[in-house]
Amino acid sequence: NDFCGCGSGKKYKTCCLRTPIELRTTWSVASIRERNLAFCKFIRDVLGISKGKTWKQIRQELSNEQIVDIYKFYSILWPRETDIYSLLPKSDGRFRGLYTGILDVRSIHKNAIPVATMFDEFLIETPIINPNNLKPEFSPITSPNQYKYQALKDILFMLQLEPYINYGHINLIPDPSEFDLELKKAMIDMSYQRRHSIEIKNTEDHKFYLQTMIGDLLNTTALMPLEVRIKILVNAFKLDKDQVIEIINEFDNDIQKSSLALLQPSSSGKDGLFMQYCMGPNYEMTLLISQVTGSVIVTDSGLRWQELMNAQHRTHGLTTYPWNKMLNAINVIPQDDQFLEKFLKTQGKISKSRELLKKVDQMILN
């Protein structure tokens, strides 16, 4: 009845007991799950959430010192010498999914989190930047003022995923190339060659990024004078002034509902605020991680889907899908409301859908 040494939070008898040693994650250091939970606890302690601080107060009071402490702790959790491959789950027979798509707290709840209920374990890449891999002038540890808004996004992302991480439904993994420079170089080279051989564009992804960028500017300029905000948006997006005024008024009417509105004056200086737009893992890393972990690739990104489709094996120029008809029949899965509200997987009909997907996966593998 002891807890398993792999750090899953489960009993040994229901976790690694029947898993061959070579397919287990390491027991000698803290697991990915344990590091993520430690990071979330540290965030809550530093920001005073554990003592009752509200999110509104945090947006008003977030300090450079808090940002430095949070990212410094993250860099300690994930040093450069981390043996990431010993920490990643292996292809051990569990029905595992790997999400590849837009990593933003405003979009992760749309598809990535809801679909996690269908898998034994669901992998999502963390959007948190590791300061160990940055030059000092770009690091949140040495330039925290530039990271005030990005820190809000990172903090909220972690705290909203924390319950799913705690229950073992979602494993928030770092990019393996952060700890393997040769891998990173190879990935960048392959990505460069692929992008120059064929250009892929997707209007839906582009539309989301445009809306996100407008939202980011609205959130970070919330306390600026109206004329300054109008000028910034007009110049940034080449929008009509009347259209910009309408956008700002609509935002201001609901500013209390915007969980990312920075409720303190921006004082980032001449360097401005750092804002990250992240889609990950990239195509090459997605294929590598899915093979290493034995994961089904899951995406809601039109761009990533096109990349995956373009890479399919072709016979005489045509792509054939042996399982196409059957997979197209499984085009709708039920939403697990209990999973989204109480972080517990529903049984019954949803359990049947879960088992069906597992069987299809096994049939294809066999």
Where are these regions (language model features)?
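Acidic/negatively charged segments and metal-coordination signatures
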Residues: 1-366
